[in-house]
Each structure stands twice: as structure tokens, then as C-alpha cells.
């Protein structure tokens, strides 16, 4: 039986109308006077810290702790502003699926497994009134490697539940092959939604446990029952 459900954010729970990508570019332009710097980055399934480090190296700037702090201070400022200017939203089926999880006879804990830095995740999810849904999580400022973020999320979930969780008791929900890979790294089950930028057929090739068009196409009882 699933005891912990870990959600990715962008392309899985919400889409921000480009606010996150724009905030990356504006922060770098504002803090380091280099415009259009984020246009070459591939964001899907990546961690914010890994993306920022790549951006620094592409522009011959030292990715020092001080420079990263300066960048992310600018990023969260712009993210908060741009979310009010872009047309994003909660993706289809998310609220109903969460309601179904809460209604299970033994509801699992709900957490986040995301490449977003924690403050960025909070800003995005508070904007869409989803932040309070989650009890635990691991983030892009915990580690640059998503597999390590998954391990941290598993450990935090175990502490929350006062139970050393086995991988098969965890369900990871995401929209990219990287979500599948990090779930496999901790032995978790995978539910993948084709609501992000990756085509259904490409996701299918990675053989997740469940693959659906969106969360309207699956019931919590299907994916959280006894194994």
C-alpha cells in the first residue's frame, strides 16, 4: 500500500505560463547585466541549482555561493511578480485527485519531489493555493541531483510517518523521464502525466507503472492500493 505520494510541480501540478523561465532570465539580467541568458537552457526535469550553475558557466561567471544567493534573491522577486502577470493554472484533475487521496481509507502523506528551490516552490504553489496540501518534500536547493533529492524526500517522508518506508510504499507523480529515473533510484512506483512538454509516446518508452493523459484519467484507488 502506498504510504507517501511525492509530486513534481511544473507540468505535473501546475503550469505557470512561463513565469519561472522568465524569472530566471530577468534575475540574471538584473543582477549580472546579461540579457536573454536563459533562452538556451532546457528546463524540463532539471533542478534550479543545476540550471543556475549552467547559466553562470555559460557566461563565464563564477557560480560561487555569493553569486548563487544573489541570483536566487532576484529570481524569487521576479517569480512572485511574474506569476501575477502570466496566465498559468492548476492542471486538469489535480484537485480531484488530491481529494481522492484524502478520502482513501488509509490516506498517504503528500509531499513534493521537485527541482525547484524551496522558496520558489512555495511561491508557485501559494499562488495557486496548493502549498498547504503538502506535508513534506525535497527541493532543488537540497541537492543538484534529482536522484539524491528523491532519496532526501524518502528520508523526510519516513521521519514524518515514523516509519522506515520501503520504495514500493512510495508513489512519484511527474511529467518527465527524469521523474521516472529518480523514482526508480529509490525503488518507488511511478505515475506519469503527459501534461508537461514531453510527448506521451516518449514517456511511454520509459515504461512507468502508470501513464495517463492527465490526472482526470486515473483514480487514487488504482494507484495507491495494496501491492
Predicted feature descriptions by range:
Residues 172-210:
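Acidic, Mg2+-coordinating phosphoryl-transfer loop and its flanking beta/alpha structural elements
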Residues 21-25, 49, 53, 72, ...:
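An amphipathic alpha-helix signature
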Residues 88-89, 111, 116-172, 177-186:
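Substrate-recognition "cap/lid" segment bordering the active-site pocket of phosphatases
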Residues 1-44, 50, 56-58:
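Active-site neighborhood of HAD-like aspartate-dependent phosphohydrolases
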Residues 129-137, 202-221:
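Structural recognition of alpha->loop->beta junctions
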Residues 6, 65, 80-112, 118:
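Short, acidic loop-to-helix structural element flanking the phosphoryl-transfer center
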Residues 32-42, 60-71, 131-134, 163-167:
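Short, surface-exposed acidic
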Residues 49-63, 153-154:
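Helix-loop "lid/cap" segments that line or gate small-molecule binding pockets
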